[in-house]
UniProtKB/Swiss-Prot annotation:
Cofactor entry: Zn(2+)
Membrane topology: Peripheral membrane protein
Subunit structure, as described in the record: Monomer and homodimer. Part of the essential Sec protein translocation apparatus which comprises SecA, SecYEG and auxiliary proteins SecDF-YajC and YidC.
Summary of the function given for this chain in its UniProt record: Part of the Sec protein translocase complex. Interacts with the SecYEG preprotein conducting channel. Has a central role in coupling the hydrolysis of ATP to the transfer of proteins into and across the cell membrane, serving both as a receptor for the preprotein-SecB complex and as an ATP-driven molecular motor driving the stepwise translocation of polypeptide chains across the membrane.
InterPro entries: Helicase_ATP-bd, Helicase_C-like, P-loop_NTPase, SEC_C_motif, SecA, SecA_CS, SecA_DEAD, SecA_motor_DEAD
Annotated protein name in UniProt: Protein translocase subunit SecA
Induction statement: Repressed under conditions of excess protein secretion capacity and derepressed when protein secretion becomes limiting. This is regulated by SecM.
Reaction(s) this enzyme catalyzes, per UniProt: ATP + H2O + cellular proteinSide 1 = ADP + phosphate + cellular proteinSide 2
UniProt GO molecular function: ATP binding; metal ion binding; protein-exporting ATPase activity
Top EC class, one word: translocase
EC number(s) recorded for this UniProt protein: 7.4.2.8
Pfam name, any one: SecA_PP_bind
Length: 875
């Protein structure tokens, strides 16, 4: 009842929004004839007129109808394609910072040209975000003629590009690129030493294609720039040898099996836990291998790394499967994206898991990496002033889009009515029976000349289906992480009569499957082609198109249900584009991962009670409903994980924003002399008062230790005893001031020897290098804190609040250490070392034209909310 009520509310909200948007569509349509009358030159001149109107105070919403009408007319002239009204609707939704759900084949690429053009008019830049380099290049090449006709520049941002190419791409009005590359460029920009090394401008408007894949599926994977850490490959090899001696606990909660296993597996959360028996066994093995001292516990603080290695090794062996989660190629372990089935070269699992899998597979173990900079996609895309996205499947995730990104989901109606037939699921007892049924369905379609797209959830499953088809000499194409070089070409021709295509987790997403095959791809095979040949190819294509339509269109076969209903809908959505005929059916077994882990015992009990014969399936709405409920459980669990990840990452995100903001101010400043003086004063005072109590005279002061401290840490030989002898009644305030003044004079004398310009250069480089070094260490420390913070729950403490409190304290300590390290280094530097230091770092030296000083009344860098003068700038 509640779900029906909420669905009704959402439906009404969607209809109300569409009603408003349709009024704007009418305005666009009314302008169409006016723009048709304009010459090409008059049409092109509109762009500069729009920009002038924006500079004079009009808003993007004010000029939207005219801008959209202009793009529609330009598209008719450049592409011979007219935007449908539903595409205008989609464009309006995207400009209003919404997620536009547009079904497959509804022309999302053409729709994107509308908001991209409009939002590029203010000169701040538009980033169009795609899932991979191929789609970025394809869409850029496809839409560039239109944008250039309208006087806009288009850039392409790919991973292999040079600094200058990237800079040029980002300076373009519209930039195409992948989510990974935009994110990494942001992180790299916050690691540079001069403004000239940055490639990105201020983040203005992001238009995300396949937004559900990027903002939902990849939300749990942070972008990380890392550097090499110490070599611990031998330890991974030794720990890997322990795993065969450990046995899994079969039924964790059963008294019969109590104490018989060494570890328990939680498949839902992909975690492994040592039992008490396992702990004792592991400790004994580690004692024997001399990796741990006798009498110590694996849980003691100095052995926590060993514990981490053991659990990583167990996860590598028991939870991560070759050809499902990863491939082994060229003596390397390559991650397979669980959502797309594509390989992710260069990506590595963190926390030692990747090294543990390398040890398991007996390939070369690469050093662990230390995080230098990181950010989640959730927090990166929230940096944009405006963000919008489009996909064919967003409605099931509308709550998450709204709660995390504050984006409404608008379901855009199709241009033509959807007539695809979605048949009920067929559920078998075993995997073997299910495979038999799938092969029979494929054979039936071949007889009808009906094309088939088989969707699998892993490389392993796609290869099982492929082997069965090869046994029967059935020609087919396989699209998975192993064979993706011609992915788009294969998927484009998957609509040919009788063609069989197997795709892992919808590889090839972003390319339309046209019934009869893709005519454009067929024509592009020829470099020089006569009009007669074109007509011949078109005639053949029309014949094959009609044959496929009469056979029932593209038939989709799902080999099992995915954890998310949305991924299932993506697979189904490949069929039935633009009113085409089509059909879909999912084949399941009780041995499927989803059914085994998440389906209720009632389904299993019912299946057994029915006493199904071999190769007999159950087809019932009750079963389908139960499966959907299992999927909803997983979706809710995954949403909770992503939400919790964001809540934890928000803590470090505040600190990251503060560090990056101050770092950029440092880089943009001509010099930081005044800031350095403030830091000197602050650091010296905080160290002096440790030896000189407040409101006291010299008889209460620890002068000997103070002089040692000043000499060792700050190379300062202050004549404190001489001052006291001359003026016995010196107060604590006066002596502190005198030491600070002495240090300032000492520093000025040093500056005379080194040279003012050189000193300014050294100050900035030292500040930046020390900040980067400490920030790197802070990220590692916070990561360790995060890994163990859940244990605070056993002490009746809120782990999140404890994490916030401790990470803030760690951040404050880091800032204090930063100031101390900078002052200590600058105090010790001499003229000869200064010259060597500048020569060593001259590639970092850039001059600027403004001076930086942190305002005493501005918010403190640490994020406490206090003014700088009352927090880390206090004197």
């Amino acid at each position: 009842m509640l779900i029906q009520f909420l669905t009704k509310i959402f439906s009404n909200h969607n209809n109300r929004i569409l009603k408003k948007f349709k009024k704007i569509v009418l305005s666009v349509n009314k302008l169409e004839k006016n723009f048709e009358k304009l010459s090409d030159k008059e049409l092109q001149a509109q762009t500069e007129l729009f920009r002038l109107r924006l500079r004079n105070g009009e808003t993007l919403d004010d000029i939207l109808p005219e801008a959209f009408a202009l793009v529609r007319e330009a598209s008719k002239r450049v592409f011979s394609m007219r935007h449908f009204d539903v595409q205008i609707l989609g464009g309006i939704a995207l400009n209003k910072q919404c997620i536009a759900e547009m079904r497959t084949g509804e022309g999302k690429t053409l729709t994107s040209t509308l908001p991209a053009y409009l939002n590029a008019l203010n000169g701040k830049g538009v980033h169009i975000v795609t899932m991979n380099d191929y789609l970025a290049r394809r869409d850029a090449e496809k839409n560039t003629p239109l944008f250039e006709f309208l006087g806009l520049t288009v850039g392409l941002n790919l991973s292999e590009m040079s600094f200058f190419s990237k800079r040029k791409a980002y300076l373009s009005d519209i930039t195409y690129g992948t989510n990974n590359e935009y994110g990494f460029d942001y992180l790299r920009d916050n690691m540079v030493f001069s403004p000239e090394e940055r490639v990105q401008r201020k983040l203005n408007y992001a238009l995300v294609d396949e937004v559900d894949s990027i903002l939902i599926d990849e939300a749990r994977t942070p972008l990380i720039i890392s550097g090499p850490s110490e070599d611990s490959s031998e330890l991974y090899k030794e720990i890997n040898k322990i795993v065969p001696f450990l046995n899994s606990q079969k039924k964790e909660d059963s008294d019969i099996f109590c104490g018989t296993g060494d570890f328990s597996i939680d498949e839902k959360s992909k975690q492994i836990y040592l039992t008490e028996r396992g702990l004792i066994k592991v400790e004994k093995i580690l004692f024997d291998k001399k990796l741990m001292n006798t009498g110590e516990s694996l849980y003691s603080s100095n052995n926590i790394i060993l514990m981490h290695h053991v659990l990583s090794a167990l996860r590598a062996h028991k939870l991560f499967v070759r050809n499902v989660d990863y491939l082994v190629k060229d003596n390397s372990v390559i991650i397979v994206d669980e959502h797309t089935g594509r390989t992710m070269p260069g990506r590595r699992w963190s926390d030692g898991l990747h090294q543990a899998i390398e040890a398991k597979e007996n390939v070369s173990i690469k050093n662990e990496n230390q995080t230098l900079a990181s950010i989640t996609f959730q927090n990166y895309f929230r940096l944009y002033e405006k963000i919008a996205g489009m996909t064919g499947t967003a409605e099931t995730e509308s709550f998450e889009f709204n709660s995390i990104y504050n984006l409404d989901t608008i379901v855009i109606p199709t241009n033509r009515k959807m007539i695809r037939k979605d048949f009920p699921d067929l559920v078998y007892m075993t995997e073997k029976e299910k495979i038999n049924a799938i092969i029979q369905d494929i054979q039936k379609c071949i007889k009808l000349n009906q094309p088939v797209l088989v969707g699998t959830v892993s490389i392993e499953k796609s290869e099982i289906i492929s082997k069965e088809l090869l046994k029967l000499n059935i020609n087919h194409n396989v699209l998975n992480a192993k064979f993706h070089a011609k992915e788009a070409e294969i998927i484009a021709q998957a609509g040919k009569p009788g063609s069989i295509t197997i795709a892992t987790n919808m590889a090839g997403r972003g390319t339309d499957i046209v019934l009869g095959g893709n005519l454009e791809v067929e024509l592009n095979k020829y470099k020089n082609i006569t009009s007669r040949k074109i007509e011949e190819i078109k005639k053949k294509w029309q014949s094959e198109h009609d044959l496929v339509v009469s056979a029932g269109g593209l038939h989709i076969i799902g080999t099992e249900r995915h954890e998310s209903r949305r991924i299932d809908n993506q697979l189904r959505g490949r069929s039935g584009r633009q009113g085409d005929t089509g059909s879909s059916r999912f084949y399941l077994s009780m041995e499927d991962s989803l059914m085994r882990i998440f389906a209720s015992d009632k389904i299993v009990h019912m299946m057994k009670k029915l006493g199904l014969a071999f190769n007999e399936a159950i087809e019932h709405s009750w079963v389908t409903k139960a499966i959907e409920n299992a999927q909803k459980k997983v979706e809710n669990r995954n949403f909770d994980i992503r939400k919790q990840l964001l809540e934890y990452d928000d803590v470090i995100n505040e600190q990251r924003s503060a560090i990056y903001s101050q770092r950029n101010k440092l880089i943009d400043a001509r010099d930081i002399k005044l800031m350095i003086y403030d830091i000197f004063k602050d650091v010296l005072k905080k160290n002096i008062i440790l030896y000189i109590p407040k409101n006291t005279f010299h008889d209460k002061w620890n002068i000997t230790d103070l002089k040692d401290k000043l000499n060792i840490d700050f190379y300062l030989n202050a004549p404190i005893l001489d001052w006291i002898n001359i003026e016995p009644n010196l107060t604590d305030k006066k002596i502190i001031k005198r030491i600070i003044d002495f240090a300032r004079i000492n520093y000025k004398n040093k500056e005379i020897l080194i040279g003012s310009n050189n000193m300014r250069i050294i100050e900035k480089i030292i500040m930046l290098q020390t900040l980067d070094s400490l920030w790197k260490e802070h990220l590692a420390a916070v990561d360790y804190l995060r890994q163990g913070i859940h244990l605070r729950g056993y002490a009746q403490k809120d782990p999140k609040q404890e994490y916030k409190r401790e990470s803030f304290n760690m951040f404050s300590s880091m800032l204090e250490l930063l100031k101390f390290e900078v002052v200590s280094f600058l105090s010790r530097i001499n003229s000869s070392y200064a010259k060597k230091y500048i020569d060593l770092n001259k590639h970092l030296v850039i001059t600027h034209n403004n001076t930086m000083k942190i305002s005493r009344n501005s918010p403190c860098l640490c994020g406490s909310g206090k003014k700088y003068k009352y927090c880390h700038g206090s004197l």
